[in-house]
């Protein structure tokens, strides 16, 4: 007894099996996490080190390079980049996908320990690391504002109480607090008052350090008691420092308040944060590479009431940005698309069968197959994301195909008068091999995807497995539940048609008759069809070469990031004004809901902005259209540029850039790099294929270069250390003492009062006390002159690097930009000492481009092997695969028509078409072979009869797949930019394939049959292999 006969005669067992599959799927669905895309984040670790006051070049040579040499030995590091700026170095390590982030972190700590002896002794702390990618957009931004508390106090609450608590939440990788710095006592010195009193800056520093100490004092005890000794050795507020005696002049006490202004302020006054034009402290939260964004955001939201309770009521804690609403909205759109696809597919079945009872059968088979897939997704550790749900949407057309083929064949026997159970057995027996061939060959398409490495392979694996599982369950259902329901539900008579549907039935009959007549003509003009087939192959090649290409569709996530790049010599005050101006322009745009931003720190001429757009339903423009509109307004702001880009769910690399794509220049000759980078950047800025061209090379910062006269210094009794200490004391925001509090430690910061450092003449007021106690002006032994200096020094590996970032103008693709850059580099004649290569997402695009054709060929070869094994033939698989060229032409023409570039999503569509369109040929070839074996028909008679008999199921399966994909094309709202390329590719390919393969497949079948007979050792045998 055949396998499926067991289920036909045991309906209860079959029903319970289907119920079990459905219940497991429902349970899996409830337990599946939610995400925008499959987990494709590279493991990234950021190492930070600081040496206050050190120049970028000093940080690069003395801090970055020793660390890089040690970190570069770690196994699994795929990319190492560093950026050194004033007083700080940051090294980004990107690891291979299969590298465990926790194991990598242990190796990073060991490498830091190994390099410790090579680092400068003056570093205030050891280098630290974080398991987060600083280039990723925050998953959530919290803001603190208050009308009563200062920015320093707000920063203290944020960094001391909120950030540590949030960091402990599962999934949180890093909490970056910006907008100010910790509270501090600031000592603003008056150089003239110091000179008048004969007090040096070192005297002030030493006096303050000696007056604020925290040392153990011991204890007193007798035979029965013990007394702990406690002194007032600490000064904690500006008021306590004000009367501090720092010197005696002619017997009179010189107090700190006599020569300085002492205030309760912050450690670094060159920091500013804002939200919607109001000063604010920002908590920018990033997730761990392996964390789920929705679960992490939900966990943070659940803790917000607790967090609010830990800070005073006068402080307002708000969510300024949250990535999760647009992700949820996108997934809801996909779920609605899935439901619409199921409804349309069932409608197609009903129109063709014109029987409510018969339609119930695939209407049951489809949900069982789709719902059952959720169980496998859970067991595989997948998530409900845009790609996995799109896989199920597309699977709707596939899973109904198997049921349609079985159902249609059984219905044909019923209409011929056969009894239901007998028809179920006979019909399933006839098409069982066909259904198996269709399903296995479709799954075979995805085998190369499962073996594909890198980011594309990780991204597509979840899609491929989800679809394959759905097809596998569909195969089981179509050979068990479907024939059982047919045998017990359908009647042995022609179904009654509703009057409304008779017209459709007559139209279908007329269409079939017309097809038969046209097929006869085609079979008599096979050479013309051969020319058409060869033409489609050539057209495929031309279209693939010419179509614009990109890595991944540009997403509208509802969030924009903006990088501010101002003149390299700009002051902090001017930069803060630019931030406010830019925020006002953006805040006034009707599509903008919220704006936050900050500037300052080690790179005064840069800033960041995070813009939340209104929900998609409340605005008519896409994110890119909004960027285009804002770009024109922002260009009118002098002295600085704001580069906007839409936040994407996929971002590769650890570089913090002001645009979406990067091109990196490397050289072992720093001078050559600095010479050629401006030339290359200016050339690229003229290209129409690129927009927002900018660079991270900043080597024209304003510098005042002091030249010591060492002979004069020796004669005057002054050493270089004393002179450098003078400059650090005066202008370096030097942290000279620590104030210990129960919750945190705060600094005493000393510098010349900003009122006396407004111009270069401030240097003339500086003096050093020599070893004879005399005040020697700085101008006696030093000269100064303005010069240029780098604001940052960047490395990749151990080579000097400069990264040029760019966005794409509307209507341009990444392939256009890549080709234009390659041409520009060739035209410029860049020397071999300067090497250029794409980085980040652009690099992955280049790698994917090189493997796309190989992947498609591998998929076709895999299908050929599977079909060859199933048919025990070298020839028939070629007949079946002859359907592919027309599908490729239709897909590529549709993409051109909709002005959609060929992306990774479109590649998925092409792979799916390889599996879909061959189903038509499989049904034709199977019936033709059966007719030749058992009907004693000639090959031409057999294929002609097969085409007519299978016309209805071919139309049904094609229209089911087409209508299953059509909602993807027509869908709007959040995430539509991901769904539409897939739908366009499939619909275009199906339409063109259906028009041509109904005629080309019979012709190819006859061609190979004649070829087989010609080379056969037994030419008299007329039966095919």
Swiss-Prot record:
<dbReference type="Pfam" id="PF00873">
    <property type="entry name" value="ACR_tran"/>
</dbReference>
<feature type="transmembrane region" description="Helical">
    <location>
        <begin position="3"/>
        <end position="23"/>
    </location>
</feature>
<keyword id="KW-0472">Membrane</keyword>
<feature type="transmembrane region" description="Helical">
    <location>
        <begin position="897"/>
        <end position="917"/>
    </location>
</feature>
<comment type="subunit">
    <text>Part of a tripartite efflux system composed of MdtA, MdtB and MdtC. MdtC forms a heteromultimer with MdtB.</text>
</comment>
<feature type="transmembrane region" description="Helical">
    <location>
        <begin position="431"/>
        <end position="451"/>
    </location>
</feature>
<dbReference type="InterPro" id="IPR023931">
    <property type="entry name" value="Multidrug-R_MdtC"/>
</dbReference>
<keyword id="KW-0813">Transport</keyword>
<feature type="transmembrane region" description="Helical">
    <location>
        <begin position="853"/>
        <end position="873"/>
    </location>
</feature>
<feature type="transmembrane region" description="Helical">
    <location>
        <begin position="387"/>
        <end position="407"/>
    </location>
</feature>
<dbReference type="InterPro" id="IPR027463">
    <property type="entry name" value="AcrB_DN_DC_subdom"/>
</dbReference>
<feature type="transmembrane region" description="Helical">
    <location>
        <begin position="333"/>
        <end position="353"/>
    </location>
</feature>
<feature type="transmembrane region" description="Helical">
    <location>
        <begin position="528"/>
        <end position="548"/>
    </location>
</feature>
<feature type="transmembrane region" description="Helical">
    <location>
        <begin position="984"/>
        <end position="1004"/>
    </location>
</feature>
<dbReference type="GO" id="GO:0042910">
    <property type="term" value="F:xenobiotic transmembrane transporter activity"/>
</dbReference>
<feature type="transmembrane region" description="Helical">
    <location>
        <begin position="360"/>
        <end position="380"/>
    </location>
</feature>
<comment type="similarity">
    <text>Belongs to the resistance-nodulation-cell division (RND) (TC 2.A.6) family. MdtC subfamily.</text>
</comment>
<feature type="transmembrane region" description="Helical">
    <location>
        <begin position="463"/>
        <end position="483"/>
    </location>
</feature>
<keyword id="KW-0997">Cell inner membrane</keyword>
<protein>
    <recommendedName>
        <fullName>Multidrug resistance protein MdtC</fullName>
    </recommendedName>
</protein>
<comment type="function">
    <text>The MdtABC tripartite complex confers resistance against novobiocin and deoxycholate.</text>
</comment>
<keyword id="KW-0812">Transmembrane</keyword>
<keyword id="KW-1133">Transmembrane helix</keyword>
<dbReference type="GO" id="GO:0005886">
    <property type="term" value="C:plasma membrane"/>
</dbReference>
<keyword id="KW-1003">Cell membrane</keyword>
<feature type="transmembrane region" description="Helical">
    <location>
        <begin position="953"/>
        <end position="973"/>
    </location>
</feature>
<dbReference type="InterPro" id="IPR001036">
    <property type="entry name" value="Acrflvin-R"/>
</dbReference>
<feature type="transmembrane region" description="Helical">
    <location>
        <begin position="875"/>
        <end position="895"/>
    </location>
</feature>
């Amino acid at each position: 007894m055949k396998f499926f006969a067991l289920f036909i005669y045991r309906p209860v067992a079959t029903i319970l099996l289907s119920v079990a599959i459905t219940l497991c799927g429902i349970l899996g669905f409830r337990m599946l996490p939610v995400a925008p895309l499959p987990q494709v984040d590279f493991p990234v670790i950021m190492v930070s080190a600081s040496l206050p006051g050190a120049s970028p070049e000093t940080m690069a040579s003395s801090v970055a390079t020793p660390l890089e040499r040690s970190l570069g030995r770690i196994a699994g590091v795929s990319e190492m980049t560093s950026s050194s700026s004033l007083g700080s170095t940051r090294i980004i390590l990107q690891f291979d996908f299969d590298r465990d982030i926790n194991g990598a972190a242990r190796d990073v700590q060991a490498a830091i320990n190994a390099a410790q002896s090579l680092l400068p002794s003056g570093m205030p702390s050891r280098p630290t690391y974080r398991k987060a990618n600083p280039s990723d957009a925050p998953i959530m931004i919290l803001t603190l504002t208050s009308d009563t508390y200062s920015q320093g106090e707000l920063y203290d609450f944020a960094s001391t109480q909120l950030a540590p608590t949030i960091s402990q939440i599962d999934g949180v990788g890093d909490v970056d607090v910006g907008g100010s710095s910790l509270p501090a006592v600031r000592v603003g010195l008056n150089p003239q008052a110091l000179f008048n009193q004969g007090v040096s800056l070192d005297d002030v520093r030493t006096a303050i350090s000696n007056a604020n100490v925290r040392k153990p004092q011991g204890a007193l005890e007798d035979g029965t008691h013990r007394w702990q000794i406690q002194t007032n050795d600490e000064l904690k507020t500006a008021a306590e420092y004000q009367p501090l005696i720092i010197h005696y002049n002619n017997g009179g006490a010189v107090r700190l308040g006599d020569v300085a202004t002492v205030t309760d302020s912050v450690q670094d006054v060159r920091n500013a944060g804002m939200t919607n034009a109001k000063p604010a402290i920002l908590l920018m939260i990033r997730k761990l590479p392996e964390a789920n964004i929705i679960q992490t955001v939900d966990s943070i939201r659940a803790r917000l009431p607790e967090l609010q309770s830990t800070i005073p009521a006068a402080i307002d804690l708000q969510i300024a940005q949250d990535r999760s609403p647009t992700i949820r909205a996108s997934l809801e759109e996909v779920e609605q698309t899935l439901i619409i696809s199921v409804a349309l597919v069932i409608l197609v079945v009903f129109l063709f069968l014109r029987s409510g009872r018969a339609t119930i059968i695939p209407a049951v088979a489809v949900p069982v197959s789709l719902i059952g897939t959720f169980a496998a997704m859970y067991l595989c550790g997948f998530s409900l994301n845009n790609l996995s749900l799109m896989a199920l949407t597309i699977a709707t057309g596939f899973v109904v195909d198997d049921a349609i083929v079985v159902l249609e064949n059984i219905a044909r026997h019923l209409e011929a008068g056969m009894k239901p159970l007998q028809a179920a057995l006979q019909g399933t027996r006839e098409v069982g091999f066909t259904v198996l061939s269709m399903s296995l060959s479709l799954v075979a398409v995805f085998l190369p995807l499962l073996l594909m490495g890198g980011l594309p392979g990780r991204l597509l694996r979840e899609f491929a497995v989800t679809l394959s599982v759905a097809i596998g369950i569909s195969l089981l259902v179509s050979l068990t539940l479907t024939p059982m329901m047919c045998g017990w539900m359908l009647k042995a008579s022609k179904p009654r048609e509703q009057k409304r549907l008779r017209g459709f039935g007559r139209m279908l009959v007329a269409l079939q008759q017309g097809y038969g007549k046209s097929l006869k003509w085609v079979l008599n003009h096979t050479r013309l069809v051969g020319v058409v087939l060869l033409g489609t192959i050539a057209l495929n090649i031309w279209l693939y070469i010419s179509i614009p290409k990109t890595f991944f569709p540009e997403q509208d996530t509802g969030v924009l990031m903006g990088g501010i790049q101002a003149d390299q010599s700009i002051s902090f005050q001017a930069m803060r004004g630019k931030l406010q101006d830019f925020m006002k322009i953006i805040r006034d745009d009707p599509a903008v809901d919220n704006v936050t931003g900050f500037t300052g720190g080690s790179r005064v001429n840069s800033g960041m902005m995070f813009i939340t757009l209104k929900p998609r339903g409340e605005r008519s423009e896409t994110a890119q259209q909004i960027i285009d509109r804002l770009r024109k307004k922002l260009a009118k702001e002098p002295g600085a540029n704001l580069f906007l880009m839409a936040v994407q769910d996929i971002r590769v690399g650890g570089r913090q850039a002001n645009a979406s794509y990067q091109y990196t220049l490397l050289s072992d000759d720093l001078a050559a790099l600095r010479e050629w980078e401006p030339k290359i950047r200016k050339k690229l800025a003229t290209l129409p294929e690129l927009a927002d061209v900018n660079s991270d090379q900043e080597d024209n910062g304003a510098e005042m270069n002091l030249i010591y006269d060492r002979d004069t210094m020796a004669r005057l009794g002054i050493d270089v250390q004393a002179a450098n200490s003078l400059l650090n004391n005066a202008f370096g925001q030097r942290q000279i003492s620590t104030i210990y509090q129960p919750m945190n430690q705060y600094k005493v910061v000393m510098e010349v009062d900003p009122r006396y450092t407004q111009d270069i003449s401030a240097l003339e007021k500086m003096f050093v006390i020599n070893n004879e106690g005399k005040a020697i002006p700085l101008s006696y032994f030093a000269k100064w002159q303005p010069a240029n200096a780098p604001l940052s020094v960047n490395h990749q590996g151990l080579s000097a690097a400069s990264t040029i970032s760019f966005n794409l103008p509307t209507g341009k693709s990444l392939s256009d930009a890549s080709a234009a850059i390659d041409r520009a580099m060739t035209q410029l004649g860049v020397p071999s000492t300067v090497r250029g290569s794409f980085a980040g997402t652009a690099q992955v695009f280049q790698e994917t481009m090189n493997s796309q054709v190989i992947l498609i060929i591998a998929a076709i070869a895999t299908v050929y092997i599977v079909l060859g094994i199933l048919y025990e033939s070298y020839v028939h698989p070629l007949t079946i695969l002859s359907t592919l060229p027309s599908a490729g032409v239709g897909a590529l023409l549709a993409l051109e028509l909709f002005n959609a570039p060929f992306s990774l999503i479109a590649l998925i569509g092409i792979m799916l078409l390889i599996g879909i369109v061959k189903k038509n040929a499989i049904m034709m070839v199977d019936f033709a072979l059966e007719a030749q074996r058992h009907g004693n028909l000639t090959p031409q008679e057999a294929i002609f009869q097969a085409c007519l008999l299978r016309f209805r199921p071919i139309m049904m399966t094609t229209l089911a797949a087409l209508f299953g994909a059509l909602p993807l094309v027509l869908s709007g709202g959040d995430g539509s930019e991901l769904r539409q390329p897939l739908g366009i590719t499939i619909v275009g390919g199906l339409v063109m394939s259906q028009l041509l393969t109904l005629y080309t497949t019979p012709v190819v079948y006859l061609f190979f049959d004649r070829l087989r007979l010609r080379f056969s050792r037994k030419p008299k045998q007329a039966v095919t292999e």
